Amino acid sequence: MGLVIAVSGLPAAGKGEFATILESNGIPVRSMGDMVRAEVRARGIPEAPQVFGEIATQLRAEHGDDVLAHRLTKAVDDLLVDNPIVLIEGLRGTAERVVFQNHWEGDFLVVAITAPKELRFERVQSRARSEDGDLSDLEKRDAREAGWGLNVIISEADITFGNESNIQDLESRVTAWLNTL
């Protein structure tokens, strides 16, 4: 079996940039956030900043905090047949981490991406995603995701990359790390 890496971090810390770097190195990516966005669309709900968090919370309430992890493991296993490394973008909760750790055991790593709140808000304003809003929305997302255990995931990550500079700096450090795997 290959290696599964899950990237975690607060909104706009740089998880997507990390995923892009790995993808450019031939590593397939599966996004937990994409699963929530697909659920919103499947339910025919208009996209708005609070909707994504509400649906993610609702899914967890209806099916357990680990619902997204269980839904994703088969797709990742399928990718591992032909790929030595697969990335899961957007690990947010301790229940999800437990599912992944139990499923892939020693072949599972957590990477945290960190950035200061002010910089994350600048990024939110520039990327114009439907789940992004104003500073208050970002703070609500931070609090909601902390409630799922995100801060624990970040503090207990196997490796942490600070993302306070530019994309070239992050890419250089991440690529150097990838070359050690």
Please tell me what each predicted stretch does.
Residues L10, L22:
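P-loop (Walker A) phosphate-binding loop of NTP-binding proteins
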Residues E89-G90, H103-E131:
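Conserved phosphate-donor/acceptor-positioning beta-strand/loop module used by diverse small-molecule
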Residues P28-L87, L91-V99:
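ATP-dependent small-molecule kinase phosphotransfer cores
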Residues G16:
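Walker A/P-loop
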Residues V29, V110, I159-G162:
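Short, well-ordered beta-strand core segments
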Residues A13:
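ATP-binding Walker
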Residues D66, Q125-T180:
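Small-molecule kinase domains that catalyze NTP-dependent phosphoryl transfer to phosphate-bearing small molecules
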